[in-house]
C-alpha cells in the first residue's frame, strides 16, 4: 500500500495492505534482509510522518483507523480509532502546531466531511498524544489530500471525489492561527475557465519558498486541463497555466 524510508535506521517501512502488517525491512545486506513484522491493522493505505519524522501515521481506511508506528523502536505505538471519521485518506497528512494542543497530524476522509487532528507529542503533551484532539468540518466528503507547510498559515483540503460538482471542483482553506474560524472556499476549477467538463481538481504542491500553491485541474482527454497557481499568503489567483501537453 505504501513504503517510506526510516530516518533512524537503514530500513524501509512497508505497509502491506490486506495483511494488516507493517514490515520494517533492514536493507544493508541486500542478500540477507532482516525484517521486523509489526501487527497493525488490515486495509492499510497511505500515510506520512509526524513532525519529528519518528512516527509513521498510516491509515487503515476500511477500518476507520490510524496506526502509529515508531520507526526508532520498530514497534506499534497505538491504533487510533476513537474520533477517526469514515475512510480516512490522508495522502501524507499534514503536520500542524495546534494553538491549544501542540503538535498534531491531520487527515481528511473519503467517507465524510471531517478533518481530524491527532496529537503527536508524547514528551510535552502526553495527555493529547495519539488521540483525536480536534475535529473540523470540511467542504464535503470525497477528500483525497490535505496539505500545509511549516512556513504556511493555511491548511488546504480537497474533495475531488465528492458527488456534487461544485464541491469536487473547490478547495477549503483553514486559517491555522484560528482553527475555529470558518474555512474559505476557493473555486479552483472555475478559476481555470476551461468551460464545461472539469469534474475535479487534485494534487497540491508548493514552490520552494512556499509563496505559491499549485493545483492540477484534471479533465477528460478530449477537453482542456490546467494548472491553477494561488498565492499562499493572500489566497488570490496568481496564474492559470494551459498547454496542450497537460491534456494527456
What are these regions (language model features)?
Residues 1-248:
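Predominantly soluble domains enriched in secretory-pathway, periplasmic, or organellar proteins
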